[in-house]
């Protein structure tokens, strides 16, 4: 996974050369070198609200539209949700996964007009599979730093244009031999978790069965398997031991967009805003001596920073819903531990006992998650947007009753890039 263009936590709030229509000089442009990482107190930042959310209906192939048409569809829906027009947007931040997924290099060169960015700042973010989350955080930091007041952020993937399996089967010296796709890379880490935690081999099937049932309640989800059963999941072919076919994410075409704005913009919004209480990014190398692929340190650090910003001391009790990046079903229990919802070796017990069900104590992926919808570049932003929908009370049939705080989570590369935000139904205090 290429880290080129990855936006560091210290750099996300400082868009080089991006001049706001309100003017970059003075206090609106004074982001400070540490503004993006949440190192400053909330009192020094502008509160950020999500006031518009739009998605395409995700499918295996959108042959009816170009990439430009796909992204404009999501952007238009986000603007309509916010009841804003293109002229209300000060800047555009877009993201997608590696270009070989479509075979179109630097597609952002062709998207300024489709996204209403002509004459305005537009930038692209790239942090592999976590890019959808990172892109939203860069946009959020532009508002928090008072560089821009209202920002359109969007992430997308049109995987039908190329072959993701081929693209992810990298040759030596970039990857070990005999790997096929992302599953070939992650399967040994799943096996290591099972051995370390003493988890029964049925847990992955439970996650897949749950998420596919949740997806039936989400009209935007790619996979709508009305005949899904636990037995069907368990009988599906083994692709990368211990990962079965039905425990694997699909390849999707789709886009997701959000409109982020400041306190004044939120006050004018016809929709209930989702307020950003904390957001962070962390990274680490793909390979290094002592790396823990089962529970990467970067993921732990990223979650800890978000919780600190949001004043969360007990995530298991204080967070009402989690949209977690789970491309292979076993990553639900693994990330439950990595994010502090369960002690080491205990995550699978939450899954097995039904805690993560839609009606459980800690619903995980009520939307159906990445296991049901996976336009890779947009998958992380969908997690963030779905978390925002939960606290707005607008998630439809997959709404978690009484959700007040929700976590959006994304990871990418060789479990090396992490991005997360926590949103709430009320403005942050302080």
Residues of each region from the PLM?
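Acyl-CoA/ACP chain-elongation machinery
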Residues: 155-156, 161-163, 167, 208, ...
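Active-site-proximal alpha-helical scaffold in enzymes
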Residues: 126-157, 183-217, 258-264, 374-395
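Short glycine/threonine-rich loop-to-helix capping motif typified by GTGT followed
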Residues: 99-107, 288-292, 325-349, 360, ...
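Long, intrinsically disordered low-complexity tandem-repeat segments
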Residues: 2-39
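Conserved catalytic cysteine-centered active-site region
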Residues: 42-46, 59, 96-154, 158-185, ...
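Condensing-enzyme catalytic core mediating Claisen C-C bond formation in acyl metabolism
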Residues: 35-68, 205-207, 238-305, 353-367, ...
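Conserved active-site "lid/cap" helical segment
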Residues: 38-130, 138, 193-200, 222-223, ...
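Beta-strand segments within the central parallel beta-sheet cores of soluble alpha/beta enzyme folds
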Residues: 86-96, 121-127, 151-155, 202-209, ...
């Amino acid at each position: 996974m290429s880290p080129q263009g990855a936006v560091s936590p210290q750099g996300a709030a400082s868009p080089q050369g991006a001049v706001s229509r309100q003017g970059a000089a003075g206090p609106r442009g004074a982001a400070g070198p540490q503004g993006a990482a949440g190192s400053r107190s909330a009192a020094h930042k502008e509160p950020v609200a999500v006031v518009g959310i739009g998605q395409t209906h995700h499918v295996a192939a959108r042959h009816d539209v170009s990439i430009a048409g796909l992204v404009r569809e999501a952007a238009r829906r986000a603007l309509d949700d916010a009841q804003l027009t293109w002229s209300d947007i000060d800047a555009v931040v877009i993201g997608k996964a590696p270009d070989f997924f479509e075979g179109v290099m630097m597609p952002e060169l062709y998207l300024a007009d489709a996204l209403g960015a002509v004459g305005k700042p537009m930038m692209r973010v790239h942090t592999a599979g976590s890019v959808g989350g990172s892109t939203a955080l860069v946009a959020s930091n532009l508002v928090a730093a008072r560089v821009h007041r209202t920002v359109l952020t969007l992430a997308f993937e049109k995987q039908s244009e190329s072959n993701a399996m081929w693209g992810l089967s990298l040759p030596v010296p970039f990857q070990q031999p005999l790997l096929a796709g992302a599953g070939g890379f992650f399967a040994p880490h799943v096996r290591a978790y099972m051995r370390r935690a003493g988890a029964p081999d049925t847990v992955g099937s439970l996650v897949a069965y749950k998420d596919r049932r949740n997806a039936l309640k989400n009209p935007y989800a790619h996979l709508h398997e009305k005949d899904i059963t636990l037995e069907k999941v368990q009988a599906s072919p083994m692709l990368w031991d211990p990962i079965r076919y039905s425990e694997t994410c699909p390849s999707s075409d789709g886009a997701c967009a959000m409109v982020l704005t400041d306190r004044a913009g939120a006050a004018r919004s016809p929709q209930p805003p989702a307020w950003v209480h904390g957001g962070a990014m962390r990274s680490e190398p793909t390979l290094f001596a002592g790396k823990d692929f089962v529970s990467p340190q970067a993921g732990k650090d990223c979650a800890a920073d978000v919780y600190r910003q949001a004043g969360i001391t007990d995530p298991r009790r204080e967070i009402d819903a989690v949209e977690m990046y789970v491309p292979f079903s076993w990553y639900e229990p693994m990330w439950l531990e990595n994010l502090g919802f369960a002690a080491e070796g205990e995550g699978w017990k939450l899954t097995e006992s039904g805690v993560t069900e839609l009606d459980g104590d800690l619903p995980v992926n009520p939307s159906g998650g990445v296991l049901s919808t996976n336009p890779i570049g947009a998958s992380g932003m969908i997690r963030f947007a779905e978390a925002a929908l939960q606290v707005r009370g607008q998630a439809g049939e997959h709404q978690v009753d009484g959700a007040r705080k929700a976590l959006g989570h994304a990871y990418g590369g060789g479990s090396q890039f992490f991005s997360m935000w926590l949103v709430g139904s009320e403005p942050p205090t302080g």
